[in-house]
Amino acid sequence: MRGNYLSLLVVLIVLASNDVLANNNSSTPKLRRSDFPEDFIFGSATSAYQVEGGAHEDGRGPSIWDTFSEKYPEKIKDGSNGSVADNSYHLYKEDVALLHQIGFNAYRFSISWSRILPRGNLKGGINQAGIDYYNNLINELLSKGIKPFATMFHWDTPQALEDAYGGFRGAEIVNDFRDYADICFKNFGDRVKHWMTLNEPLTVVQQGYVAGVMAPGRCSKFTNPNCTDGNGATEPYIVGHNLILSHGAAVQVYREKYKASQQGQVGIALNAGWNLPYTESPKDRLAAARAMAFTFDYFMEPLVTGKYPVDMVNNVKGRLPIFTAQQSKMLKGSYDFIGINYYSSTYAKDVPCSTKDVTMFSDPCASVTGERDGVPIGPKAASDWLLIYPKGIRDLVLYAKYKFKDPVMYITENGRDEFSTNKIFLKDGDRIDYYARHLEMVQDAISVGANVKGFFAWSLLDNFEWAMGYTVRFGLVYVDFKDGCKRYPKKSAEWFRKLLNEKKND
């Protein structure tokens, strides 16, 4: 255990030695496209449930998010759902035109599992209308010179599998996900060359099974009495285990059946903030290391070594599932690239380990907070959790480089939100500042050796923002949900257009 801590401290020291200041009070950085490698990819991202709509059309089966938001509207801040969302199911050509107009050369989207397999598995049949929709989207992208980056799971587990065996609580889901991935590779892999198996498995685990504020809304009663059921000390680890194995199974089927002919790459999109020690004390430094172990390392370590982080093994003990030797072999090296979703950072402070009301949140024995001595780590966006700390994206990327064998990386999500208003709001200077500062930090990480190949802005469109509904907006493009989902590019879209056309930003 001591060796593990020492190796992490070496990483932290290296990051500190390469430190650059990110002064939130300075003027917005001026960037050029030529500041980045010639083959660097610039794109934007969305997810199926957040933008598609058409939730009950053309044979699509329900997902757990349909059930969660439609059956329990009180769990969504404005009582809304994604049944229509941005109506991208019908307006996808407009979305592709916007991407082309801005100058992006890649688009990260997710495939709705239940649009392909309405009941989640092969026994329930394949929905050809779903296959046709994604073929049309992919072909439209390619016709405009835009590379498709496809995510196979962005939180929308088919409700039929949740009903059958508890969704990702059941080991059966690994085979069902493998079969679903096989269908995706078979039908789209001749044109899609960049795949992500899962998006933010950490969010699925934490918000769906510990906090209970996202689908399927499970948690311990002492955490949230409104949860329908659950156990925040055990279920998150079971779900995380099956998510990791599902990833491994999908990569395995690609490499065995499709890699030779399709020559694509398969990765995963992981989210994490950077965790700074609350003080410079050794205890708080170790607390920050544990916080990383239970977030980013939780899903990265098994893909590199076939094992869980030592801190998780030591703290969770018998509640943490074990990989068999065969599973470890399957997982080790099961990625061609790593996607990193970064928004914010926090401080971590050492606290005694809990013996009462234990959950995954208490297991790291670290208190995670966005402020120190009453001072926030950075300015707050609309969402309470989104405190702006640009340097964190650099530190996280370099952490991944130094600790996990210098992987190929893409920034697969990065962005900030503003509150929704009754007026069309296009002058999003704060978003421009956010992107400029974070891209500056990404460029700095590249300059010291980080193997970052691309950047995807979250999000192309204002959309259904999960438990927040439509109360906040992350889009480069304003969507008028009251007027047929009309799209209006914001100033940030124009900023990207100028950047990608090699003009100096004012």
UniProtKB/Swiss-Prot annotation:
Reaction catalysed? Hydrolysis of terminal, non-reducing beta-D-glucosyl residues with release of beta-D-glucose
Q: Which UniProt keywords apply?
A: Apoplast, Disulfide bond, Glycoprotein, Glycosidase, Hydrolase, Secreted, Signal
Query: What start and end residues bound the annotated signal peptide?
Result: 1-22
Catalytic residues of the enzyme: E200 (proton donor), E413 (nucleophile)
Q: What induces it?
A: Up-regulated during abiotic stress recovery.
Q: What does the record list as GO biological process?
A: carbohydrate metabolic process; kaempferol O-glucoside metabolic process; quercetin O-glucoside metabolic process
One term under GO cellular component: apoplast
Q: What class of enzyme is it?
A: hydrolase
Glycan-bearing residues:
N24, N25, N81, N226
Residue pairs linked by disulfide bridges in the UniProt entry: C219-C227
List locations, semicolon-separated.
Secreted, Extracellular space, Apoplast
| EC numbers on record | 3.2.1.21
Where does the chain bind a beta-D-glucoside?
A: Q50, H154, N199, E200, Y343, E413, W458, E465, W466, F474
Superkingdom as given in the UniProt entry: Eukaryota
Q: How does activity depend on pH?
A: Optimum pH is 5.0.
Give the main localization category: secreted
Provide the GO MF annotations for this entry: beta-glucosidase activity
Bilayer-crossing regions: none
Q: What does this protein do?
A: Beta-glucosidase involved in the rapid degradation of flavonol 3-O-beta-glucoside-7-O-alpha-rhamnosides during abiotic stress recovery. No activity with quercetin 3-O-alpha-rhamnoside, quercetin 3-O-beta-galactoside and rutin.
Family stated for the protein in its record: Belongs to the glycosyl hydrolase 1 family.
What's the name of the protein? Beta-glucosidase 15
Originating species:
Arabidopsis thaliana (Mouse-ear cress)
Its encoding gene is what?
BGLU15
